[in-house]
Amino acid sequence: MEEIKLNTIEEALEDFKEGKFLIVVDDEDRENEGDFIIAAEKITPDKVNFMMHHGRGVLCAPISEERAHELELEMQVPDNTSVHETPFTVTVDRLGNGCTTGVSMYDRAQTILALADPNTRPSDLGRPGHICPLRARSRGVLRRAGHTEAAVDLARLCGMQPAAALIEIINEDGTMARLPQLWEVSKRFGLKIIAIKDLIAYRLKQESIVEKGVEVDMPTEYGHFRLIPFRQKSNGLEHIALFKGTWDENEPILVRMHSSCATGDIFGSMRCDCGGQLLQAMEKIEKEGKGAIIYLNQEGRGIGLMEKMKAYKLQEQGMDTIDANLCLGHKADERDYGIGAQILRLLGIKKMRLMTNNPVKRIGLEAFGLEIVENIPLETAPNRYNEFYLRTKKERMGHELHNIK
């Protein structure tokens, strides 16, 4: 069987600048699909026809959050419950400019061009329509490893307007095209094919999203460590790397990616297992003689201390930890692993033995181009205050908790 060899991001960017299609694939643990993606400002009726004929999916137009705001494109629903939280806005058609029903290849191309044109006003777009804009997250693939963000990132990296067109690639028999079939499609049409994880790695190498502080000695009750603070450039949040020992970049290092928990880490709360996991991680690293804890300022799975306390109040009234978050308008987990991934890279860690019970954390870090060679559980003994919480994490979030029957 022919070896599948993906293109480099540098090769892909050259084609993208010229208005050529790229095939972009995501992680097999996510959607495991490939999309045709092209810069919005390079679209033509013939290219729309190609996408519809050979892609067979849903024709969408990813745009930046800022662009969606400028065009007054509201989200399609206030509470997105789709599997991967695909960020659909209201659908649109270009008004005027020779457009009629909005469904022809010409009309669709005109609508996509209008989304990219900085002169387009909200009143130039009819709602609903035949094009589905997608609102990309700020910070792109460094925030969400999806095709929407990849498309906008590619446009920005090429110096174009932050807008693109994409469509999923479906086999002729109606099944989703996976990597072997996508590889054949790329050869058939002479298109470059790239992976989102490689785009993430490219951006992490090219861009700095955190500012490194001074390194200091940090003796603790659980071992002797070194500590470096990091400041997130986008919002000023400060994070910590607590580590011990030295290593080379190909060595699998013991790592704990730990989100801050003031109640558990500082006060020893029995409502969660956070404090116990942190201490276990420190003890394991001390025993091993090398390793790192990335302490992320993402209280309450990313919702903040005030909102976490509101969630606690709802839990006292009978809700579980997930439903409490959802009731408050949050996702079950809002953490951003891109920050931790860059901190690990700055520490020279590319391979790790990850200390976690959370499969989503593993997937989240692997999406940023890091290799996890082993998963090491950090289990604490349940108590009467946190047993329901731990059971929820096991049954609804897939955590590997053998102490919970």
Swiss-Prot record:
In the N-terminal section; belongs to the DHBP synthase family. Pfam families: DHBP_synthase, GTP_cyclohydro2. The active site is at 333 (proton acceptor), 335 (nucleophile). It comes from the Bacteria. GO terms for molecular function: 3,4-dihydroxy-2-butanone-4-phosphate synthase activity; GTP binding; GTP cyclohydrolase II activity; magnesium ion binding; manganese ion binding; zinc ion binding. It catalyses: D-ribulose 5-phosphate = (2S)-2-hydroxy-3-oxobutyl phosphate + formate + H(+); GTP + 4 H2O = 2,5-diamino-6-hydroxy-4-(5-phosphoribosylamino)-pyrimidine + formate + 2 phosphate + 3 H(+). D-ribulose 5-phosphate binds at residues 30-31, 35, 144-148, 168. Residues 1-205 are annotated as: DHBP synthase. GTP binds at residues 256-260, 277, 299-301, 321, 356, 361. HAMAP family: RibA, RibBA. Pathway: Cofactor biosynthesis; riboflavin biosynthesis; 2-hydroxy-3-oxobutyl phosphate from D-ribulose 5-phosphate: step 1/1; Cofactor biosynthesis; riboflavin biosynthesis; 5-amino-6-(D-ribitylamino)uracil from GTP: step 1/4. It comes from Porphyromonas gingivalis (strain ATCC BAA-308 / W83). Binds 2 divalent metal cations per subunit. Magnesium or manganese. Binds 1 zinc ion per subunit. One of its GO terms (cellular component) is cytosol. GO terms for biological process: riboflavin biosynthetic process. The record marks 130, 168 as: Essential for DHBP synthase activity. Zn(2+) binds at residues 261, 272, 274. SUPFAM superfamilies: RibA-like, YrdC/RibB. Its cofactor is Mg(2+); Mn(2+); Zn(2+). This is Riboflavin biosynthesis protein RibBA. Mg(2+) 1 binds at residue 31. The keyword Transferase does not apply.
